[in-house]
Amino acid sequence: MKAIVQDKYGSAEVLDARDIEKPQIGDDQVLIRVHAASVHLGDWVLMTGSPFVMRFATGLRRPKNQVPGTDVAGTVEGIGKDVERLRPGDEVFGWCAGAFAEYA
């Protein structure tokens, strides 16, 4: 799948469009086919790693999650075995890690 990938902290120059593996679905997770993702201040903070204290949660030397983006809207493609409230085909929006990709 296509995704925006970030291997290090910095400005927009650290972002790279690449093909990566589609995320695996955990037992209590949902796979979303992304139709839209927004960019906001929180994404900028996570991308730049500033203030430095944030890196204790997001990765000291480089981001733990290489695909940025948190706000997402799309269609449910798959569900884990413990998911009860959603079904494939449902349209959803919300917060997740890795929204800047074809699947999150």
List PLM regions with ranges:
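Glycine-rich beta-strand-centered segment in the early N-terminal region that forms part
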Residues: 21-39, 52-98
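A short, acidic/glycine-rich surface segment
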Residues: 15-16, 62
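Short, Lys/Arg- and Gly-enriched loop/turn segments at beta-strand edges
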Residues: 99-104
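Short beta-strand-to-turn element immediately C-terminal to the catalytic PLP-Schiff-base lysine
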Residues: 6, 47, 77-78
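Short structural boundary motif marking the start of a folded domain
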Residues: 1-4
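Short N-terminal binding/cap micro-motifs at the start of the first secondary-structure element
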Residues: 10-15, 41-42
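A generic structural motif
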Residues: 6-8, 95
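Short Gly/aromatic-enriched secondary-structure transition segments
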Residues: 44-54
